A protein has these predicted regions:
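Gly/Pro-enriched, hydrophobic low-complexity segments
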Residues: 60-160
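Short acidic/polar capping segments at secondary-structure boundaries
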Residues: 15-17, 25, 50-51, 77-80, ...
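An acidic-aromatic
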Residues: 1-40
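Hydrophobic, well-structured mid-protein blocks that either form specific transmembrane helices
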Residues: 24-69
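Glycine-centered secondary-structure boundary/capping sites
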Residues: 35, 49, 154, 160-161
């Protein structure tokens, strides 16, 4: 998989030869690849330790009913809950994020299971993503590079020859 911000490139691997795919990044979803409807931009934000924020009109901070910590609830005017952000007791660390559709059904859940300091940045060491039902995966990030010079060509996956 690769993305240059304009296009999302990937190889679909099944029986036979890999199939090269190129779709607009704005339409990209990893549903066909990992069975979770998450956008590549969201994955990149999560890997960078950022929280992808959904459009919202209201923000409410609640103390968690079970366990310690707080929940930041982002709501849209006619939609209801768009996103929930679960934080620690000090409100300094995000532990879990949940995204919802307009029916209130969970789209996906992302958890920062372990964090690490790399060159002064707080980034995930272990990240888990789930649809809340039958699909989930875990990313273990053990090599992190920061402030690396990059060129546009590094983000393009070319079709096979």
């Amino acid at each position: 998989m690769a993305s240059d911000g304009k296009w999302f490139y990937y190889y679909e691997i099944g029986e036979g030869n890999p199939i090269y795919k190129k779709i607009p990044a704005t339409d990209a979803s990893l549903m066909r690849i990992i069975s979770i409807p998450i956008q590549p931009a969201d994955i990149l934000d999560l890997i960078a330790g950022r929280v992808p924020l959904r459009e919202h009109h209201t923000v409410i901070l609640h103390k968690q009913d079970t366990g310690q910590g707080y929940v930041l609830v982002l709501k849209r005017r006619w939609w209801g809950v768009a996103e929930k952000i679960y934080m620690d007791e000090n409100k300094t660390r995000v532990r879990l994020i949940e995204y919802y559709n307009r029916n209130g059904t969970l789209i996906y859940r992302a958890g920062f299971n372990e964090m690490q300091m790399v060159s002064g940045f707080q980034v995930p060491a272990r990240l888990s993503i789930s649809n809340g039902e039958d699909a989930d995966f875990q990313l273990d990030l053990n090599r992190y590079y920061t402030d690396v010079p990059v060129t546009d060509s590094m983000f393009v996956l070319n079709p096979p020859d």
